[in-house]
Amino acid sequence: MDINLFDFHLPEELIAQVPLEDRETSRLMVLDRETGDIEHKHFTDILSYLHEGDCLVLNETKVMPARLHGVKEDTGAHIEVLLLKQEEGDKWETLVKPAKRVKEGTVISFGEGKLKATCTGTADQGGRQLEFSYDGIFYEILDELGEMPLPPYIKETLEDRDRYQTVYAKEIGSAAAPTAGLHFTEELLEKLKQKGVQLAFITLHVGLGTFRPVSADTIEEHHMHAEYYHMSEETAALLNRVKENGGRIITVGTTSTRTLETIATDHDGKLCAASGWTDIFMYPGYEFKAIDGLITNFHLPKSTLIMLVSAFANRDNVLHAYNEAVKEKYRFFSFGDAMFVASHAKMRNK
């Protein structure tokens, strides 16, 4: 399948550069995955689309301030490091710039020596394995010295780093935020709970591959980056109870979707406690096994994320919805507006 089938025209001014002042004031497009019908709402209207017995699945990963600026100890040359994945102990898979200056044995110093890293291995596209040394607690030092790794399409400086975290972020380890969750406030989540909507939490640590474009000409040639996920026994039991009682499982974001669909695929359609690495790639033709609805942002043209949404809601429906979003001047990407995709006609008949 040609990746150009997932292209659409997006004016640059619709790429949201900063978050809205209030999280829940973003707009919400409601898309019926079966009919393609569209409604234009605000995010707080999600309350009227979710019912007692439904369950929202939220990714409680926390974004690391994963971008570090340091200098080579021997020459003083500036080096930028982006942490991608913790491998073992203090060893990390990273991206460095300029990569040609960092060879095996190179030592990089950050914060006037408060944190140091030695290159222990190299990979393609600027990939380097670094082993860190420090006194104290690594994540406290990282919090002091690091910057939030905003996506490349965001050019503005983020004034408040908490705005690139969900209000329920807990498990540190992501190089990017699960952005569909950025729309929720603690007050909105409380209102949903009061209505009888269950909240379930999983963890998937978002990797930098989220921003990497599909370089292959066809979908089938593309290989997804692997990301670590975890679902507890408590969450699995809750989701199974929801299913048994006729409720719907609504994932907040593509990361929650990938987690549930990975587990269901690996366990004959069942949801159970599991941890591991997933490189699942969902595109039209994929049959969903776990979810009934999806809350997600508006994604990049030709991205694996728009392919996932197209697998769930039909490519023609999704591209029509995206063209409507452009026409109605919705805000796109990480700090943009949201879409709620489900079989809404069936839902209204409940």
Swiss-Prot record:
Pathway: tRNA modification; tRNA-queuosine biosynthesis. InterPro entries: QueA (IPR003699), QueA_dom1 (IPR042118), QueA_dom2 (IPR042119), QueA_sf (IPR036100). Belongs to the QueA family. One of its GO terms (biological process) is queuosine biosynthetic process. Monomer. Transmembrane segments: none annotated. It comes from Bacillus cereus (strain B4264). This is S-adenosylmethionine:tRNA ribosyltransferase-isomerase. GO terms for molecular function: S-adenosylmethionine:tRNA ribosyltransferase-isomerase activity. The lineage of its organism: Bacteria, Bacillati, Bacillota, Bacilli, Bacillales.
